Amino acid sequence: MVICPIRAISVIRGYTFGCGGAALGNPRLNVKENAQRSTSNVQHRMKRPVHLDEEQVREHLRMEELIPAMEKALIDFSAGKVTQPVRSVITIDPPGGFFGMMPARTPEGLGIKLVTFYPPNAKLGIPTHMATIFLVDPETGAPLAVMDGRLITEMRTAAVSAAATKLLASSDSKILAILGSGVQARSHVEALRLVRQFEEICVWSPTKAHAERFAEEIGAKAMSVEQAVRGADVVVTATSSRTPVLQGAWLKAGCHVNAVGACRPDWRELDDKAMGNVVYVDSREAAMKESGDVILSGRKIYAELGEVLAGKAPPRGNETTIFKSLGMAVEDIAAALLVYRAATKKSGR
């Protein structure tokens, strides 16, 4: 038996020997094996990111689940639980559109949406809005998913309007007016029908043929913009107009308006009289930088929708209300997480 008061280690021909002459192995091989083992462990923890196209997103996103998810996202944002800068925009002129970057850190996720708006695309038969959403693991920064964001943008916008309508519109609302005939108009009909039992839907679009086709699809009536708005309990403006299409003089007392177009500081959908009612927004900061309806009218914002949902401000639903929606990254991340969780659950990842 060899007694080693001080542990002795010697190296002979690349092999390490400790006390008693036991071979401990080649140190170079140990380093290589450890590195390989470490790499394997990292790869096991870092699964390959999920890639989802629009049809896969559609498969996993349900409006019934999206509306409450948007309510929570709005509450979290207004409560200061979300880190989110105002959308960063690069103007693309021509064709008079923009490229936007929308990152957010939420209580449940981290990611960014990249969005483009190209108005001339409408004449080409392709979407005017296109987007991609990138999710990462908040704990490690590892990529989780890359998914198409066009449908998410369309659906989450309508879901937020549904949350506003549920909160602010009369519970016995019967007539819905839709100004516009594009994807947002269609998505809003789907979402708003989940929160109110409308008996009649009136449609207007700048292009009469588009309005008539859309009205036929959803079982509505196509008419002039004034005819559509007068008498309506809920109004949606979902147009690409840069000048007002909705006049406040047409609004029924106590009606609710979801204004979802005009997302630039010099664009408008509503005139000053319409904006003279009780105005709600998704984000005060964003509205004061991006909303021409708010900026150019000079109208004071009453509350963020998340503040009302959280009970921090009364809804004032008995008055004529305007919800100016600009869209926020927190909404995109919340919606993308619904899709990601459903997709990974189905695949067993």
Task: Report the location of each language-model feature.
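N-terminal ligand-binding/catalytic initiation module
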Residues: M46-E154, A162, D172, A329-I333, ...
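Adenosine-phosphate binding glycine-rich loop
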Residues: E54, R58, R264-R349
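Short helix-loop-beta connector
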Residues: L168-I175, Q197, K252-A253
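Glycine-rich Rossmann-fold phosphate-binding loop(s) that bind the pyrophosphate
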Residues: S181-G182
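N-terminal Rossmann-fold NAD(P) dinucleotide-binding loop
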Residues: A185-R186
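NAD(P)-binding Rossmann-fold cofactor-contacting core
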Residues: L194-I218
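Rossmann-like adenosine-cofactor binding region
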Residues: A220-L296
